[in-house]
C-alpha cells in the first residue's frame, strides 16, 4: 500500500502511514514523496493507521516534515481509534472536523480541535486544548476551556466574533483592519502577560 498523501483542504494534507512496513521504511518513503515541491510549506495531519509510534517516533516524523518546510498539526490513529482515546498515556487527542461550521452549529471536545473549513459567524467551538482552523474563523472559539493557558487558536484568517483562551476574552474590533483583511498570512492567538495576543505566522 505504501505511504499515502492526500489533500484534505488547501493547504492541509493527510499523511497515512503503512502499518505493514517499519517506521524507517515509512520515513524513507515519506521523504521521497515530500521531495515534490507541491508539498513544501504545507500543514499535515499524520494518521499512523495502527503503526506503533512512541513520542520519539512522532518527533522523528515531525523533523522530517520540518526539513521540507511542512508542519504537523496533529496525529491520529484511525485503525484503532477507540483504544487510542482510552490510553492513559495519551497526552491530548485530536478531533478533526472535515467541514465548514455554519451559523448555529457547535463543536465541543476534550482535546485539540482541527477544522478543515471555515467557522462562520454564530458557530461555536469549545475545546480543552488548542483550536486550529484551516480557513476563515468568524465565529466564537473557546480554547483551553478547562483552564489551559498554554492553548492557542490558529486560523488562515482570524476575524472572530469572540476568542476565549482559558478565562481570557478578546473580541474583533468594530472597524476591520483593511491591511489585515488583505493579508494571506495565517494568524495565531495566545496568552501573554495576562492578555490574548494575536500575531501573524511567518
Swiss-Prot record:
What SUPFAM superfamilies does the record tag this protein with? Cell-division inhibitor MinC, C-terminal domain (SSF63848)
Function in brief: Cell division inhibitor that blocks the formation of polar Z ring septums. Rapidly oscillates between the poles of the cell to destabilize FtsZ filaments that have formed before they mature into polar Z rings. Prevents FtsZ polymerization.
| Top-level taxon of the source organism | Bacteria
Which Pfam families does the UniProt entry name for this protein? MinC_C, MinC_N
Q: Does the keyword Cell membrane apply?
A: no
Which biological process annotations from GO are given for this protein? cell morphogenesis; division septum assembly; regulation of cell division; regulation of cell septum assembly
**Which terms are listed as keywords in the entry?**
Cell cycle, Cell division, Septation
Q: Which InterPro entries match?
A: CAP/MinC_C, MinC, MinC_C_sf, MinC_N, Septum_form_inhib_MinC_C
Report the family membership.
Belongs to the MinC family.
Q: Does the keyword Cell division apply?
A: yes
Which organism does this sequence originate in?
A: Sulfurihydrogenibium sp. (strain YO3AOP1)
**What protein name does the entry list?**
Probable septum site-determining protein MinC
Q: Indicate the quaternary assembly.
A: Interacts with MinD and FtsZ.
Entry-linked NCBIfam families: minC
Amino acid at each position: 500500500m505504501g505511504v499515502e498523501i492526500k489533500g484534505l483542504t488547501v493547504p492541509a494534507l493527510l499523511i497515512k502511514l503503512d502499518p505493514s512496513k517499519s517506521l524507517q521504511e515509512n520515513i524513507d518513503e515519506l521523504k521521497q514523496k515530500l521531495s515534490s515541491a507541491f508539498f513544501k510549506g504545507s500543514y499535515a495531519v499524520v494518521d499512523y493507521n495502527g503503526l506503533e509510534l512512541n513520542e520519539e517516533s512522532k518527533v522523528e516524523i515531525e523533523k522530517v516534515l520540518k526539513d521540507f518546510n511542512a508542519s504537523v498539526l496533529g496525529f491520529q490513529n484511525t485503525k484503532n481509534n477507540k483504544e487510542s482515546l482510552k490510553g492513559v498515556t495519551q497526552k491530548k487527542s485530536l478531533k478533526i472536523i472535515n467541514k465548514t461550521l455554519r451559523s448555529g452549529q457547535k463543536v465541543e471536545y476534550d482535546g485539540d480541535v482541527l477544522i478543515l473549513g471555515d467557522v462562520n459567524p454564530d458557530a461555536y467551538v469549545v475545546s480543552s486544548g488548542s483550536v486550529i482552523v484551516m480557513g476563515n474563523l468568524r465565529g466564537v472559539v473557546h480554547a483551553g476551556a478547562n483552564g489551559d493557558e498554554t492553548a492557542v487558536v490558529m486560523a488562515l484568517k482570524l476575524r472572530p466574533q469572540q476568542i476565549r483562551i482559558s478565562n481570557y476574552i478578546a473580541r474583533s474590533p468594530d472597524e476591520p483592519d483593511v491591511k489585515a483583511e488583505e493579508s494571506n498570512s495565517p494568524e495565531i492567538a495566545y496568552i501573554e502577560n495576562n492578555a490574548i495576543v494575536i500575531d501573524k505566522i511567518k
